[in-house]
Regions:
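Conserved AMP-binding/adenylation subdomain of ANL enzymes
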Residues: 196-213, 220-279
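A short helix-loop-beta submotif of the ANL/AMP-binding
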Residues: 50, 56-76, 80-84, 92-98, ...
Length: 279
């Protein structure tokens, strides 16, 4: 909301789809988040509920995390390439009632394990391709849920405002699961204080401002992406750019020309190798 007031018509998010960059301003992003938050309330989402998110980096999935937070729920991002058993463990461990799935691949993985998930109530899917003939008894399309939320603003607007006002600095902000290389993944709980202070201090250290351009390509379930693509973006007001796919990432990187770019050593090694091959 602060960024919408201060930066209004400035680009907040971009996504490349079918080779074309789509963009949303801060004002548009706030409306998207609010519509989904109201939609979640219409589904009966309660304070403290866990809302899982599975898929590649997309503005809509970042907004899903913000929508969950705005109603007092806890977002739980899941690694995009997680297999069914891994997803089942996370959803069961955190007692997730809702999950936002990016596409048919993610929906299929969840439907395969749904019988073992007693608490899962609704699967909210983003990309409808391939899902038209599915049984929709527990499926809900993302944009349709937003439309329902917009229609319920008169009835649920006060409840949303009440939940937002009731949040504190030490409330849970997000739950991130470890990779599980040494055993079962562990849920790491970060408070609003954890995320805000880390984002503030790291942004000040790197002298980041609202004019930065960042490419969001690292796993959404990783604490690094959460800090860079969520925390710092909200703190500074810079623009988060989501590539079309892993295959187009380098092309998308050149087109955006990020002013702030984070990568683990392996990514830089691969980039250096590609350059050396072409020389």
């Amino acid at each position: 909301a602060r960024n919408a007031r201060e930066f209004g018509d400035k680009a907040a998010y971009r996504e490349k789809e079918f080779g074309i960059w789509q963009s949303w301003t801060w004002l548009e992003a706030v409306e998207q988040v609010e519509a989904l938050a109201l939609g979640l309330l219409s589904l009966g989402a309660e304070k403290g509920d866990h809302v899982a998110i599975a898929g590649r980096n997309r503005p809509y999935l970042y907004w899903a995390m913000l929508a969950a937070q705005s109603i007092g729920a806890v977002p739980v991002p899941i690694y995009q390439d997680a297999v069914g058993d891994e997803i089942a463990y996370v959803l069961d461990h955190c007692n997730a009632r809702f999950i936002v799935a990016g596409d048919q691949e993610q929906v299929d993985k969840i439907l395969d394990i749904r019988d073992s998930l007693k608490n899962l109530q609704t699967i909210i899917y983003l990309d409808p391709r391939g899902l038209r003939k599915y049984d929709h008894s527990m499926l809900k399309q993302y944009q349709s849920l937003q439309d329902e939320g917009r229609g319920a603003r008169g009835d649920l607007g006060d409840e949303l405002a009440k939940r937002q006002k009731a949040q504190t600095y030490d409330d849970t902000c997000v739950m991130l699961y470890t990779s599980g290389t040494t055993g079962r993944p562990k849920g790491v709980v970060l408070s609003n204080r954890n995320v805000i202070e880390t984002s503030k201090n790291s942004s000040q250290f790197d002298d980041l401002g609202p004019g930065e351009e960042v490419l969001a390509y690292l796993p959404m379930a990783w604490v690094g992406d959460y800090t860079f693509s969520m925390g710092q973006a909200l703190w500074t007001g810079f623009c988060v750019n989501c590539p079309e796919s892993a295959e187009t990432m380098m092309t998308d990187l050149r087109e955006i020309g990020p002013t702030y770019y984070f990568a683990p050593p392996r990514v830089f090694e691969n980039q250096l190798t590609n350059v050396m091959i072409r020389m």
